[in-house]
Amino acid sequence: MGIGKTTALRSLCGSLMSSSDVRNLDLAAHSKELTTVGTEFGEIDLGGGEVVQICGCPGQERFSFVRQWVLSVSLGVFIMVDMNAPTSLGETLHILEEIRQLPTSPVTLVLSARPATTEQIETFAQGVYSAGYGVVPVLEADPRERAQLLDAMGVLVSMLSLQSENS
């Protein structure tokens, strides 16, 4: 909760986005005013009539059914984490396991949405690898910075392109 998923969608899509934010009633878990309670959709206009459709879903476990549906229809996925949170690796491994269970797994990239040291990122990536999920790229991207998010999307598109060449 509060990693910046809605902010990232707004940064990428601007007004071409539908939000599912409501007033946060779980102030004990997080002090933010609003929280996401459903899937959010947006489009990035690439020009020339081409668009990329993106969606985001709440991270809380009580919304796992929403996340599982989104994962099942996705080609590529960003898992947004705060490397400073002690639970970030475990939560990421949980989502990676959900992805592994799908009939067709989307290409996956981890976004460190809060400042992290190179050592933290390398330790995190090694933890993912050691848990048996292979090499999952880990990039830093501020959810408020459209250019950083577009760079991360470029990496995801490259991964999708490589995947289609190898299949």
Label each PLM-derived region with a short phrase:
Residues 49-52, 75-76, 105-108:
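Loop/turn-to-beta-strand initiation segments
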Residues 62-85, 98-102:
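Inter-motif core of Ras-like GTPase G domains
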Residues 81-134:
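Conserved C-terminal guanine-recognition region of P-loop GTPase G domains, centered on the G4
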